[in-house]
Amino acid sequence: MLVKTTHFGEINIKDEDIIEFSEGIVGFEDIHRYGIIRNQNSDSPFSWLQAVEKSELAFAVVDPFVIKKDYDFVLSDEYVKALDINDPSQVNVYAIVVVPDDLTKISMNLKAPVIVNKDNRKAAQVILDTDEYTVRHYIMDELQKQEV
């Protein structure tokens, strides 16, 4: 699918990389279809969610398990059913990233991960019922902990 974007110009997103949020993303509930744009650097855990219907809307995302090794949560039965998940191997998890001017403050939202069933391309942003994670988990702090 050819998609015109503000950030990447005109790009071709494969059909298998188009995902659908039945309820949208928090704050953007009216936008349902996004394309996953993977980083050209295969070692990078970062990707983009580009709105198909809104050229200027794109979210930087990251595989949270690469950054926070002990990230763990239980997906409610409601979402397992809504996304038709039968096996954990069907799932990709992304955290939305905020990239401020001060890159030392780059953060990811661990409180509301994006869950994608990669088999049927259904997706949902899930707000976790826990105080263990925040919407602003600092990536550089987490990486520094791993170096110690």
UniProtKB/Swiss-Prot annotation:
InterPro entries: Flagellar_assembly_factor_FliW, Flagellar_assmbl_FliW_dom_sf. Its main location: cytoplasm. Gene3D superfamilies: BH3618-like. One of its GO terms (biological process) is regulation of translation. It comes from the Bacteria. Acts as an anti-CsrA protein, binds CsrA and prevents it from repressing translation of its target genes, one of which is flagellin. Binds to flagellin and participates in the assembly of the flagellum. Interacts with translational regulator CsrA and flagellin(s). This is Flagellar assembly factor FliW.
